[in-house]
Amino acid sequence: MRILGIDPGSRKCGYAIISHTSNKLSLITAGFINITTTRLQEQILDLIEALDCLLDRYEVHEVAIEDIFFAYNPKSVIKLAQFRGALSLKILERIGNFSEYTPLQVKKALTGNGKAAKEQVAFMVKRLLNITSEIKPLDISDAIAVAITHAQRLKLH
């Protein structure tokens, strides 16, 4: 089973596709979608086109998205919510459903501590998937962590 994990952001959207077979996890691909245009409509279109390319290239069975975190800048939250809405609609069209996890749930699933630092999550991602190279930026390790969290939840059910 292939799981797409997404860490949406207003400038970078981290993504990762992992394989979950026979209690074994392996990384298929990971990266980020760089949002460089300035107009909101173009940003949303670029994001959705990149997601379409990922879904066309890889046979994805499940999708997990990190939920919006609290932010002090209301404009950032609104923009992020618009991106998540566009992503959600595209995923519903292509896959049929998705799961959502809060940052606290992801951190707790990977480190056992819901208040863990991003670096601790990245360390556990590397350890669980036997990755020796550095994972940068942290949006990528966050997306991998979201996918791993979903794999763990599927295993429990």
Swiss-Prot record:
Compartment(s) of residence: Cytoplasm
InterPro entries noted in UniProt: RNaseH-like_sf, RNaseH_sf, X-over_junc_endoDNase_Mg_BS, X-over_junc_endoDNase_RuvC
Chain positions recorded as Mg(2+) 1 binding sites: D7, D139
Reaction catalysis annotation: Endonucleolytic cleavage at a junction such as a reciprocal single-stranded crossover between two homologous DNA duplexes (Holliday junction)
Gene3D superfamilies: Ribonuclease H-like superfamily/Ribonuclease H (3.30.420.10)
Enzyme superclass (EC): hydrolase
Binding-site residues for Mg(2+) 2, renumbered to this chain: E66
Active-site residues (renumbered): D7, E66, D139
Assembly, per entry: Homodimer which binds Holliday junction (HJ) DNA. The HJ becomes 2-fold symmetrical on binding to RuvC with unstacked arms; it has a different conformation from HJ DNA in complex with RuvA. In the full resolvosome a probable DNA-RuvA(4)-RuvB(12)-RuvC(2) complex forms which resolves the HJ.
Family: Belongs to the RuvC family.
Name the record gives this protein: Crossover junction endodeoxyribonuclease RuvC
Higher taxonomy: Bacteria, Pseudomonadati, Campylobacterota, Epsilonproteobacteria, Campylobacterales
Gene assigned in the entry: ruvC
